[in-house]
Amino acid sequence: MKSLAKLKSEKGIWLHDSEMPTVGHNDILIKIRKTAICGTDMHIYNWDEWSQNTIPVPMVVGHEYVGEVVEIGEEVRGFAIGDRVSGEGHITCGHCRNCRAGRRHLCRNTSGVGVNRAGAFAEYLSIPAFNAFKIPDNISDDLAAIFDPFGNAVHTALSFDLVGEDVLITGAGPIGIMAAAVAQHVGARHVVITDVNEYRLDLARKMGASRAVNVAKESLKDVMNDLGMSEGFDVGLEMSGVPAAFRDMLDKMNHGGKVAMLGIPSGDVAVDWNKVIFKGLVIKGIYGREMFETWYKMASLIQGGLNLAPIITHQFNIDEFQQGFDTMGSGQSGKVILNW
């Protein structure tokens, strides 16, 4: 079958003829329709230090997708041939304390689709049926293909009550922008997002952010004054992984504020812990999506009128994959879809 795989320990990704995946007793086989390029895929493409230490070569990559069930393992219940599905990319062990307590997003033995096992950038994908999520008929293939990163945004944004609150989001990548849209949709008062990429800040404005701030040109404090905010932000969503952005967030938080962190710093981060202590801040780390509460919330948000369509800015056929990766790497895009 046709696939996109990491075949060499160097920058790049290659179109490859891979073997069909096997289907176990508890698995389903999915014929892929659309996939989306993730930041993780870009790390693997660029073959950075994390990728070199994590990704076995060769490896079919990719974990954002939508497709159709074409084969079902003999022990599988609840799925039928023809079901349209996306899926949770974190394969959990099922036997650790957190898994057994229903907190599978905190499994200490997680295996990643397209990272530790064969991924979705292929004509077919086999995953445990437990990890598949049926897509409602009134949600498009395009939106279903980005449910994985949308789930990161939803998990982060809905970690704390946002109704009537002032929200600061640092990092206007696709996930940060979707988090801004979610915060606005569920009733936040002011949603302010920061970055230095004008293309993505403009996209954030289109997605409903109250203010999209280029911190290289504009003071966040001035923006707060313009909005009549005298006490600081109630909720912070750190999506950038940039130490300076996190420190600025802590400085601008109100006393008793709550911070959810999804962005991954490249190294150690120096923090003024006095601000955390004396402001009484709560900081929560976010990894992946809650299984499967986040997934049901995603579908409900879209069915309830949340418009994510503007975040999908480019589409390419799979034979044009190089153009897709170049576009994603340019920083001048939202989500990039590859059609199979």
Curated annotation (Swiss-Prot):
Binds 2 Zn(2+) ions per subunit. Its EC number is 1.1.1.103. The active site is at residues 40, 43. The record marks 148 as: Important for catalytic activity for the proton relay mechanism but does not participate directly in the coordination of zinc atom. Disulfide bonds: none annotated. GO terms for molecular function: L-threonine 3-dehydrogenase activity; zinc ion binding. NAD(+) binds at residues 175, 195, 200, 262-264, 286-287. Zn(2+) 2 binds at residues 93, 96, 99, 107. GO terms for biological process: L-threonine catabolic process to glycine. Pathway: Amino-acid degradation; L-threonine degradation via oxydo-reductase pathway; glycine from L-threonine: step 1/2. Zn(2+) 1 binds at residues 38, 63-64. Gene3D superfamilies: Medium-chain alcohol dehydrogenases, catalytic domain, NAD(P)-binding Rossmann-like Domain. Belongs to the zinc-containing alcohol dehydrogenase family. Catalyzes the NAD(+)-dependent oxidation of L-threonine to 2-amino-3-ketobutyrate. Homotetramer. This is L-threonine 3-dehydrogenase. It comes from Pseudoalteromonas atlantica (strain T6c / ATCC BAA-1087). The gene is tdh.
